[in-house]
Structure formats: C-alpha cells, structure tokens
Amino acid sequence: ESRGLGDVYKRQALMVCDKPGAFVNERAARYGIPTFTFNPKEYPSKADYEREIVRRLRAERVELICLAGYMRILSDVVLEAYRDRIVNIHPSLLPAFKGAHAIADAFAYGVKVFGVTIHYVNGELDGGRIIAQRAFEYLGSDPEELEARVHAVEHPLYVETVAKLVAEQ
C-alpha cells in the first residue's frame, strides 16, 4: 500500500489473490480495484485455476503482472501467456538466497549487506532476469528488525520499478 503510485493504481485492472480472507482484498476494494480471489482447493488442478487466472487477466486486458506475496510457483499456463510480462519482488540480492526463507537464510549465513531484487518471472525459482536491486548494510542482531528494514526498502523499490515499467508500455 505504498503511496505515490499515481497512474499505476489508476491503470491496475485486476488484483488476483489465492487467499480469500487476505487483508489485501480489503485494500484493493478501498482503491476500487477489481479482485479475483480464488481458493486453489476448489479447482481440480493447478492448471485449471491458472487457466482461470489467465482468462480473467485477458478479459481485463492486463499487460503486466506484478506479484507480491504470491507464494505459488507459476506453471507454463501463466508463464507462456505472459512471457516477459510478470515481475516479482524478492527479499535478497539475487542470485543469492532464493526461495521463501531468503531473509532468515541470509541472516543465518551472517550476511552484512542485504537487499531486495525485482525480477522477471520465468520457470526457475527466483531465476528470472533482474530488473532492479537495492542493497543496504545491516550489522544488527535482530532478525525481526532486519525483516522490517527489508520491507522498508522493498516497497518503495517495487513502486519505482513498476512505475517505470508501466511508463515504458
């Protein structure tokens, strides 16, 4: 819920969420953003719910997909429909510390320079082409404080990066 998105919010056509009770649904409603919320368990297969996602995205003429907190690996159903048009945010300086526990893994490893990466999504976990990165030094010893610092860096970077991508379209 970063400020300063301007035209990015105005152009957002659809918010897709795989968690029916998630607070992000309320946020989207507050901004007047249409939402497709689904429960993956209600579909016979991953391919079925991903086909429905693609159908809805196409119906809204979505050109760019921006993932945030979507903790599922996208299959070729979505990747082929939106090749080079899906971006994700990751809480490490990729290619280091891929996966869902990047902050904890980097902290446990003793890293002193942390960061955030915005990247295109491809078939490899956190393996797409890097669009933007921002690093910062952290010498503290509190993992919760580190996580808060990561989020303080990633939100503005994602807003800036998405705004640039939208402006280029």
Where are the regions a protein language model picked out?
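Single conserved hydrophobic/aromatic residue that forms the stacking wall/gate
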Residues: 1-9
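Short, structured coil segments at secondary-structure junctions
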Residues: 4, 31-32, 82
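Short, surface-exposed acidic-centric catalytic microdomains
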Residues: 10-52
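Donor/substrate-binding cores of folate-linked one-carbon enzymes
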Residues: 18, 64, 68-169
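Short phosphate-binding loop-to-helix
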Residues: 41-67, 72
